[in-house]
Amino acid sequence: MDYKSTLNLPVTDFPMKANLPQREPEILAAWQQGDLYGTIAKAGKGKPRYVLHDGPPYANGHIHIGHALNKILKDIILKSKRMQGFDAPYVPGWDCHGLPIELQVEKNLGSKKHETTKLQMRKQCREYAEKFVHVQRAEFERLGVLGDWDRPYLTMSYDYEGITARELARFAENGGLYKGKKPVHWCSSCVTALAEAEVEYADKTSPSIYVKFLLQDDIGGAVPALAGKRVSLVIWTTTPWTIPANLAVALHPELDYVALETGGEVLVVAEGLKDAFMAATGVQGDVIATFRADILYRKRCKHPFYDRDSIVLLGEHVTLDAGTGCVHTAPGHGQEDYELALVEGLDIYNPVDNRGRYIQSLEFFGGMFVFDANAAVMEKLREVGALVGQGSVEHSYPHCWRCKKPIIFRATEQWFISMEKNDLRQKALTEIDRVSWVPKWGRERIHGMIENRPDWCISRQRSWGVPITAFYCTECGEILADGKTMHHVADLFMAGGADLWYEKEAAELLPPGTVCPQCGKSAFEKEMDILDVWFDSGVSHAAVLENRPELGSPANMYLEGSDQHRGWFHSSLLASVGTRGVAPYREVLTHGFVVDGSGRKMSKSVGNVVAPEEVIKKYGAEILRLWVAAQDYRDDVRISQEILTRLAEAYRRIRNTCRYLLGNLNDFDPDVDMVPYDRMTELDRWALHQLEVLKEKVAAAYNEYEFHILYHAVNGFCTVEMSAFYLDIIKERYTSRKDAPERRSAQSVMYLVLESLVTLMAPVLSFTADEVWGYMPKRSESSVHLATFPEFRPEWKDESLVERWARIMAVRGDVSKALEQARVQKTIGHSLDAAVTLAAEPGLLSFLQEYAGELSTIFIVSRVDLVEEGAGDYPAAEGVSGLRIGVSAAPGEKCERCWHYDEEIGGDSEHPTLCPKCAAAVK
C-alpha cells in the first residue's frame, strides 16, 4: 500500500520562489484596478484621523535612493496607523517651481534662451515639471506606496499658486512683509538671491590677509604712550575682494587691546590674539600700551586706498576665535556688518553687480569679477603699504546648492518677512517646544537656527515661480503691497494661475479704481521678482492641509531628511506661525542620508551610487522596503550589494515560514476546526505566548517608529521560535489523523501565527503580505491592507510555561549536539535513527519525567529513555549541568510511514510495516 496519500503533507499553490521583480507589478496592477487606496479611504470614514503631510520632492529627474527611503518610511507609518484603526490619508505632493527646473530649461534652450519671453519660459518650465511628476509618480508607486496618486498636490497648480499669493497677502496685512536693502546670499552664476536652505558648505582655499587701517585721530589724551605716534588698527579677512566696500572697523566693547610698537609704527590688536597675530605675520614688537576698546569708539581710520574714512565702531559680534579682534566691516557684504551699520547710521554700500562684478565706476577694480579681484586687491594693499601679512586658509565656504559655485554676501533690494514684527521669532521658538521631535536633538537644531536667523529673504530674481504681487506707482515710486490688492490678485491666480501676472498689464490685475495712496495717480508697474520656493512649499499647510477635507491642520507628522530643519520644517514653521500663531505639525521625524556600505557619501564619480530602479530590477521593491525597515534611519543609512543580499536571505526565511504555514492549513477551516486555548498542548500554548510577545514588541516598534526593532523581532520569530523550534517539532503531526486533536491544535496555532504575522508585516512587506493574504483560509478582508493588527491576548502569556520550556530547549540544544557527534561517528544517519538516553540528577530527572511522552517528538528521535544520574557512563552535556547524554541506534524496525524505529512494528497484520501509532492513524 502507498501510505504517502495518508500523510498530511503541506499543500499550497503559494509559490516558493518569490520572483518579486515580475510578481510585484501584477500585485500593483490589481491594487490599481480594484482602487485599493479608494477602498481604504472609504473604510477610514468616521475613524480617528492621522495626517502625515508629504514634504514635496522636487519635480526634476528620476527618484534616487534617498527618495525611496523617505517615501517608504512614510508608507510604513501610514499603513501601520490604518491597521491600528486610524483614518490615515496620504496625499503626495511635488515642488514644481524654482531654479533647478529653470536652469534645466535654459540649458535645453541653449542660445535661444535670450529670445525667450518670461511667459514662454514659464510654459516650458511647467511642461518640464509635469513630465517629471509623471515619471516620479510611477517610480514611487512601484515602491508599493499607497496614496491618492491621481490627485496629488502640485505647487504649480492654479489653486496652490492662488493660495500661495493669498498667504503672502496675509503677511502684508499683518505688517510682516517689507522691502529693504540687506546683504543676502547671492549666486552670481544663477543671478539670484538664495535662501539659507539653498546654501551648501564645501571646503575652499581662500587668501588670509592682515591689513592695517591708519588711525586719523590722535588718542594720545586717553593713551599717553601713543601721543604723536603713527597708529594703525589691524584687521584680518579671508575675502580681500570686500576691502573696497569697507566702511568701518569693529572692536569688542569689553576686550582689552594692545599697542605693539614695531619699526617706527604702532599696530593695535586684541590682547588675547597678540601672540597668534605675531606668529602668523612674523611681526616683532613690544607692547607699549593696553587699553579698552571704548576709547576708540567713532574715531576715524583712513581707508587703505580710497580717499574716505573708515569709522571705528563697537560690536558684540567680535570674538577672540581668530584674527585680530579688529573686524573689517563692509555693511553691504555681511549680516553682522549690516546690523551694526543700521545702528550706527552707516550706508549699506555694495559696489558689486548681479553677476558678481564690481560696478564699472569703482576705482582700480571696475568690471572685475570679485573672486578674480582678490589678487588685485592684495597687490594694491601691498603697493600702498597696508598689507601686514598674507597666507591662505582652508575653510568651509558657502556654495550654491544648484550650480555648486561659491557665493557671496551682497546687499540688494529684496522682499523680507520680519522675524521681529508680530514677535515671529519668539512665537516660533515657543511652538518648537510644543512639538515632539524624533530624534530629540531635532529640537535643539531647529531652535538654534530660528534663534539666530536673520529676516527671511523671500524674493528671487527669476521667472519660474509665484510672483510677489506688489506694484509700484510710476509717478512717485510708492510701493503698493496691501492686503486688499494682494488678495484680489490671489483670487485671479486661483482661477487662472500665476501666468496671469505676465499675460496682463498692471491695470488689469489691480482692483478697479486703485490709486496711489501717496500721490493719487493710477498708473502702476508690476514687481517682477518671484517668491522663494521655500515659501511655496512652506505654505502647504494652507494650500493642502486646510484645503483638502480629508486632511486637516496641524498635521500629526512631518517626516523628511535631517537637512529639512533648515528647509521645509523651517519655512513651514515660519509660514504657519507668522499667520496663524501655531506650528503646522505636532511631531517631526527625521532620517539620515543614504551612504554606501563603507559609510561614504554617494557620488557618480566614485561609482558607488545605488539607484532604486537597479535594486527593484534585481531584488524587487520588497527588499528595498525591508532595507528601510532594517536600518536605524536616525543616523546615516548604509546600502550595498552585501547588505541587500543579506536582506534578501532574511526575506526568503520569512516567505518560507509563511509558505510552510499555508501548506499546513490547506484543510483547515478556522470557523470549524479552531481548538480553544485551554484544550491545546503545552507546546502549542508556548507558541502562542511567543506570538503574544512578538505582537507586543512589534506594536511598540510601530508606535515608536523603531522599525529596525520590528524587523529583527519578525525575522527572529520566524527563524528561531518558529522554524528552528516549534515548526521543527510539530512536523511529526503530519502523520496524525486529519482531524486528530493534536493536529488541529497545531493548525490552530499556525493559523493564528500566520494571521498575525501577515498583518504585522504588511506595512513593511506590503506586496508579500497581500500575496500571502490571498491564499489564507477565511480571510476577513479582500486585501491585508484593509485588515487591522491582531488584538492583544494577554491570557496567552504564561511565564511559568515559558520557563519550563526554556529548560526543555536547553536540554534539546545539548541533545542536538550529541546527535551531531553520533552522526560524525556514523552511529546514526538521520536523527530518527537514534535512541537517546538522558541520565539526569534527581531534580532534572523529575522535571523531564513530566514530559516523558513528548521528548522523542521534541528531540526528533525514535526513542528517549530517562535514567538516574549514575546509571551508565555517558558523556556530560555541554550546557545543562547534572545531565549526561547517550546516543545509540534505535532498536526495532523503521516505520514505512513516519520513519520512526519501533519494536512493535508488525503487530498489525493489516499494516505490517507500520508502527502502532501510524496503523491507528490510517484505519
Swiss-Prot record:
Alphabetized CDD domains for the sequence: Anticodon_Ia_Ile_BEm (cd07960), IleRS_core (cd00818)
Domain of life: Bacteria
Main location: cytoplasm
Entry keyword Mitochondrion: no
Function (record text): Catalyzes the attachment of isoleucine to tRNA(Ile). As IleRS can inadvertently accommodate and process structurally similar amino acids such as valine, to avoid such errors it has two additional distinct tRNA(Ile)-dependent editing activities. One activity is designated as 'pretransfer' editing and involves the hydrolysis of activated Val-AMP. The other activity is designated 'posttransfer' editing and involves deacylation of mischarged Val-tRNA(Ile).
PROSITE patterns (alphabetical): AA_TRNA_LIGASE_I
Binding-site residues for L-isoleucyl-5'-AMP, renumbered to this chain: 560
GO CC, alphabetical: cytosol
Reaction catalysis annotation: tRNA(Ile) + L-isoleucine + ATP = L-isoleucyl-tRNA(Ile) + AMP + diphosphate
Quaternary structure note: Monomer.
Subcellular location as annotated: Cytoplasm
Cofactors demanded by this protein: Zn(2+)
Primary enzyme class: ligase
Protein name: Isoleucine--tRNA ligase
Motif ('HIGH' region) on chain: 57-67
Species this protein is from: Geobacter sulfurreducens (strain ATCC 51573 / DSM 12127 / PCA)
Keyword ATP-binding: yes
UniProt entry keywords in alphabetical sequence: Aminoacyl-tRNA synthetase, ATP-binding, Cytoplasm, Ligase, Metal-binding, Nucleotide-binding, Protein biosynthesis, Zinc
Gene field: ileS
Domain-related comment: IleRS has two distinct active sites: one for aminoacylation and one for editing. The misactivated valine is translocated from the active site to the editing site, which sterically excludes the correctly activated isoleucine. The single editing site contains two valyl binding pockets, one specific for each substrate (Val-AMP or Val-tRNA(Ile)).
PANTHER family assigned to the protein according to its UniProt record, in alphabetical order: ISOLEUCINE--TRNA LIGASE, MITOCHONDRIAL, SOLEUCYL-TRNA SYNTHETASE
Short name of one Pfam family: zf-FPG_IleRS
Gene Ontology process terms (BP): isoleucyl-tRNA aminoacylation
HAMAP family: Ile_tRNA_synth_type1
InterPro entries: aa-tRNA-synth_I_CS, aa-tRNA-synth_Ia, Anticodon_Ile_BEm, Ile-tRNA-ligase, Ile-tRNA-ligase_type1, Ile-tRNA_ligase, M/V/L/I-tRNA-synth_anticd-bd, Rossmann-like_a/b/a_fold
EC number, as in UniProt: 6.1.1.5
GO MF annotation list: aminoacyl-tRNA deacylase activity; ATP binding; isoleucine-tRNA ligase activity; tRNA binding; zinc ion binding
